[in-house]
Design a protein with these regions (language model features):
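Secondary-structure boundary/capping residues
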Residues: 74, 111, 247-248, 294
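Thiamine diphosphate
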Residues: 1-134, 142, 277, ...
């Protein structure tokens, strides 16, 4: 059953498609709370609900996410659209607070695909599994297709994917910011001959402790990139994990603030989220260039 809350176009449900779907499609109106409660109830009774919602509106349903869905561990699927700094830019419709909101509720599995193929594979898995409520942060902006094989089973939770194995610096590039991670990887090689490790975390809700421990052997610096607010976000989980170790961790994301009618390029620069700014920060702040380049 497909569910929307006043925004059927978020899932491409035109009037013709809604007519064709019949009772398999439900729009509850501007009532996100009811949509999540409905999805939870359907899942509890063996159905396969998929609720599509814009990031900016999911905040209205926090009580139902926690009390109805996650406490009961009902395997409904939530598709969170436009969870990105590049989404709607007026102060009442900001789209970058969903990671702290959703990912810190117990039992929830929040996934961050990096491309079309990964998104569709995660969606297929989430519909057929029966163990967890699953939310998927649908890739936004210029994320289209990777053209590479992706995994089909995500049951082994919190296992990150190493996209490129290097040393000294590890880049954890979450979801829509994976492309930024690729740019940082290339620029580090070009500017300082540093062959960094690039990681696709995939899971927003947990830490791959085995991989994080492996990095200690030949890495001095871990950076996280997330297309959202830093406070309560993904990067803080990684920083906390390494808190009692010698590993240096730098988190890149947006400052916790209300911004209105902003220019996205200006916002990215203000938060040091361009590849040039990130690489300059890595090379000219602690640890020193000598530490991470070995020169």
């Amino acid at each position: 059953v497909t569910i929307t809350s006043g925004t059927p176009a978020v899932l491409g449900f035109t009037p013709d498609r809604r007519q064709e779907a019949g009772k398999q499609f439900v729009d509850v109106g501007i009532a996100e709370e009811h949509a999540v409660a409905l999805a939870s109830g359907i899942a509890a009774n063996g159905g396969k609900p998929v609720y599509g919602v814009y990031s900016t509106f999911i905040q209205r349903s926090y009580d139902q996410l926690s009390q109805d869905l996650c406490i009961n561990n009902n395997p409904a699927v939530l598709l969170v659209f436009w969870g990105t700094l590049s989404g709607m830019n007026d102060v009442t419709h900001l789209c970058f607070f969903d990671i702290p909101l959703i990912s810190n509720i117990p039992n929830m599995v929040y996934l961050a695909p990096t491309c079309k193929e990964e998104y569709l594979a995660m969606l297929e898995w989430s519909i057929h599994q029966n163990e967890h409520p699953v939310a998927i942060r649908v890739p936004a902006t210029d994320v289209i297709s990777c053209g590479e094989p992706v995994e089909s089973d995500y049951s082994n939770l919190n296992r990150y994917k190493v996209a490129h194995r290097g040393s000294k610096v590890a880049i954890l590039a979450l979801g829509s910011f994976f492309g930024l991670g690729q740019s940082v990887l290339s620029l580090l090689k070009e500017k300082a001959n540093i062959d960094a490790t690039l990681i696709n975390p995939r899971y927003i809700t947990g830490v791959d402790s085995e991989l994080m421990d492996e990095l200690k052997a030949d890495h001095e610096l871990v950076i996280t990139l997330e297309d959202g607010v830093l406070d309560g976000g993904f990067g803080e989980k990684i920083a906390r994990y390494y808190g009692a170790t010698d590993m240096k961790v730098l988190n890149y994301g947006a400052k916790k603030e209300f911004v209105d009618r902003y220019d996205i390029q200006e916002l990215l620069r203000a938060n040091h989220l361009t590849d040039e700014q990130i690489v300059d920060c890595l090379l000219y702040t602690s640890p020193s260039p000598r530490d991470i380049s070995g020169s």
